[in-house]
A protein has these predicted regions:
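Short active-site loop/helix that positions an aromatic residue
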Residues: 39-46, 63-64
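Structural motif
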Residues: 9-10, 26-29, 49-52, 70-74, ...
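Glycine-rich anion-binding loop/nest that anchors nucleotide
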Residues: 149-155, 178
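Short acidic, Gly/Ser-rich segments with clustered Asp/Glu that frequently serve as metal-coordination loops
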Residues: 16-20, 28-42
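N- or domain-start disorder-to-order transition segments that initiate the globular core
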Residues: 1-12
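A short glycine/serine-rich beta->alpha loop
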Residues: 26-27, 153-159
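Long, charged alpha-helical interface segments
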Residues: 85-123, 137, 161-247
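Acidic/Gly/His-enriched mid-domain segments of enzyme catalytic cores or analogous surface patches
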Residues: 52-145
Length: 247
């Protein structure tokens, strides 16, 4: 599908709609609310030195081979199941591990793939409800003159309600900070969704949220529904997400 990116703020509802050529010069925020980007942000807030988003289990193990034993934590999922031998992919469960000062290599079905897909942009950030205000503050300060593209990871080629909602949260904050005069229709739609319902309510009733509750992960969903409670701004540089310190 051809997506026009001639607006100041645009939203893609699926990672598959990314156009690698049109990424050049743009600022990209990648979202996977349940749970990839929420987990990576939480890990960095909990003291991890960095997070390396991997495409899959094999890619993660390949990356881990370059680290000293004990300095790295492998975590992730495939089709929502924890990869055998890896730490769990959800925020609270991963934070139960000793992450302080260690590198986290993290592989997921959608979110980490989207981050890798977006790597050709001028600036790439991992965003979630958890750090929305911090990311927008940073972008407004450093990249206000660029086109901002919010990428929803989605699920297996389909849009996810929680990612669309998260995109709306970012659009709302960007509009309040930089103005709402040049939003794409997709950005307006995401903003309307965000304004329609509280975060926890929507995340608990969406398809992925219900699936996670059936797996006993209701508290993880509630954790990911908290808005702007973390100051971590993870920027992707050379395949690594490290926290960008707010000035």
């Amino acid at each position: 599908m051809l997506v026009q990116l001639n607006h100041k703020v645009h939203v893609l509802f699926r990672r598959q709609d990314l156009d690698m050529v049109k990424l050049q010069g743009k600022t990209v925020i990648v979202l996977d609310i349940l749970f990839a980007t929420s987990t990576m942000i939480a890990a960095l807030a909990d003291g991890a030195a960095e997070v390396l988003p991997a495409l899959n289990e094999g890619h993660a193990r390949e990356k881990a081979a370059g680290f000293e034993r004990g300095s790295v934590v492998l975590a992730g999922e495939l089709f929502a199941d924890t990869i055998a031998g890896f730490a769990p992919p959800t925020p609270m469960a991963l934070m139960a591990h000793d992450l302080h000062g260690r590198s986290v290599i993290y592989a997921t079905t959608n979110g980490t793939v989207a981050l890798n897909d977006a790597a050709g942009a001028a600036h790439v950030y991992a965003g979630a409800l958890l750090n929305a205000a911090a990311v927008v503050e940073h972008i407004a300060r450093h990249h206000a003159d660029t086109t901002i593209l919010i990428v929803c990871s989605g699920s297996m080629g389909n849009p996810n309600l929680e990612d669309m909602y998260g995109a709306g949260c970012f659009v709302e904050l960007i509009a309040n900070t930089l103005g709402a005069h040049d939003l794409s229709d997709a950005a307006w739609a995401a903003r309307a969704l965000y304004r329609s319902e509280a975060a926890e309510s929507l995340l608990m009733r969406c398809r992925v949220g219900q699936m996670m509750q059936a797996r006993g992960l209701a508290e993880e969903v509630k954790f990911a529904a908290r808005e702007s409670v973390m100051q971590v701004v993870p920027k992707l540089v050379d395949g690594r997400l490290a926290p960008f310190a707010l000035a």
